[in-house]
Amino acid sequence: MRQVLLNIVIAFLWVLFQDEDSFKLSTFFAGYLIGILVIYILHRFFGQQFYLKKVWVGIKFLAVYLYQLITSSMTIINYILFKTKDLNPGLVTYETTLDNDWEVTFLTILIIITPGSTVIRISKEKKKFFIHAIDVSDKEKQKLLKSIRQYEGLILEVAE
């Protein structure tokens, strides 16, 4: 948070040093870019990672989630239209490495809002998920577990 505020201050100082008659967004943006460069060079002195890294992880997370959402939605549509007799619903267990309550909650929400699966129960230790899936054949089960591991990895990356 300190890095963002410092970057905004650098951008405003840049605007002031330009000695223009009116505030121009382009000048502020140029100052913000200069601030990014300065903060990137000096971020080691803050004792934190560079703040735009989290922004990049957030964008990557959003892209992965949207991809998973679209592909799982297409799979569910395919099941509904063509494979209603081939459904093999069941329970899948998944052991997580997440520690914080918010991380576990976030993973649970991601599983629930992805079509075709829902979390039925979480163990008392908050380490094991019991997930109901629309198809638990080996291939579909592996796809589900792969997407959950991918979510979990991104959550850990954001939590760093």
From Swiss-Prot:
Keyword Ion transport among UniProt keywords: yes
Keyword Membrane carried by entry: yes
One annotated Gene Ontology cellular component of this protein: plasma membrane
Disulfide bonds: none
Alphabetized UniProt keyword annotations: Antiport, Cell membrane, Ion transport, Membrane, Transmembrane, Transmembrane helix, Transport
Compartments (UniProt record): Cell membrane
Annotated TM spans: 22-42, 61-81, 102-122
Topology within the bilayer: Multi-pass membrane protein
GO molecular function terms noted in the UniProt entry: antiporter activity; monoatomic cation transmembrane transporter activity
InterPro entries: Cation_antiport_E
Quaternary structure, from the entry: May form a heterooligomeric complex that consists of seven subunits: mnhA2, mnhB2, mnhC2, mnhD2, mnhE2, mnhF2 and mnhG2.
Similarity-based family: Belongs to the CPA3 antiporters (TC 2.A.63) subunit E family.
Protein name: Putative antiporter subunit mnhE2
Gene source species: Staphylococcus saprophyticus subsp. saprophyticus (strain ATCC 15305 / DSM 20229 / NCIMB 8711 / NCTC 7292 / S-41)
